Regions:
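Active-site and donor-binding regions of nucleotide-sugar-utilizing enzymes
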Residues: 5-8, 15-20, 24-25, 65-167
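Conserved beta-strand segments of alpha/beta enzyme cores
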Residues: 31, 58-61, 120, 169-171
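Short N-terminal binding/cap micro-motifs at the start of the first secondary-structure element
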Residues: 13-16, 42-44
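A nucleotide-sugar donor-handling region in carbohydrate enzymes
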Residues: 7, 41-43, 146-211
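Conserved nucleotide-sugar phosphate-binding/catalytic loop shared by glycosyltransferases and other
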Residues: 32-75
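Cofactor-binding loop segments of dinucleotide-utilizing enzymes, especially the Rossmann-like FAD-
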Residues: 9-10, 36-39, 126, 175
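PLP-dependent amino-acid enzyme catalytic core
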Residues: 1, 25-27, 61, 73-80, ...
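Structural beta-sheet core signal
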Residues: 6, 34-36, 100, 123, ...
Length: 212
């Protein structure tokens, strides 16, 4: 049986990972080891580990790493604390693989510790571009530390290969969030209009906001 360690640090990436977590948990040949860290354990961000427990994942490792600071120094220190915690967890669990998604510094810490433990890393959503943001440097650094790569598009797959990764280790599988779309129970038009208090027959503009 293979020990698969999956790391989650925020609600955003947990929502994408959830279908995969269920698959691993149900697989007779795999043993899921979930590591919950970062914002999930912070009162400032709503203690969202409780949502993970409500989904049935009640047994997991906790890695307390988030300092109450939004400075660059605080972020760097949080990453350092996180790396120490991940190293201790990996030493105890001895996973066969670490699965990570995205480009946050919590995930960078998880990847760096796994690499130094020579644990294979499976990285989801590599090869993407976020120009002008630190996310891009973190994402590409994680790519270079990883063994297996699961990209959302063929363009991203080619970018990972251009970075020197072996083509047979880079797989274009689509966006993981599609699994949620396939299973999501959608509102009908009438319910949607009622929930937002607005008729979709009227002209409208949809704006999304992604804070830096």
């Amino acid at each position: 049986m293979k020990k698969i360690c999956v790391v989650t640090g925020t609600r955003a990436e947990y929502g994408l990972l959830r279908p995969l977590l269920y698959r691993i948990k149900e697989d007779a040949e795999s043993e899921l080891h979930l590591v919950v860290t970062g914002m999930h354990l912070s009162p400032e961000f709503g203690l969202t580990y409780r949502e993970i427990e409500q989904d049935g994942f009640t047994e997991y490792e906790r890695n307390e790493m988030l300092l109450s600071s939004d400075t660059k120094n605080g972020t760097a220190k949080s990453a350092g604390v996180g790396m120490v915690g991940f190293s201790d967890i990996y030493a105890r669990i001895r996973p066969d693989m670490v699965v990570i998604l995205g480009d946050r510094y919590e995930i960078f810490a998880a990847a760096a510790a796994a690499m130094l433990h020579t644990i294979p890393i499976a990285h989801i959503h590599g090869g993407e571009v976020t120009r002008g943001a630190v996310d891009e440097a973190i994402r590409h650094a994680i790519t270079k530390m990883s063994t297996l790569h699961f990209t959302a598009t063929e363009r991203y797959r080619q970018r990972v290969i251009q970075m020197g990764e072996q083509p047979d280790h880079v797989h274009c599988v689509g966006a993981l969030g599609i699994e949620n779309i396939r299973t999501q129970q959608l509102f009908d038009r009438e319910t949607m209009e009622e929930s937002i208090g607005f008729s979709l027959d009227r002209p409208f503009v949809l704006v999304t906001f992604h804070p830096a």
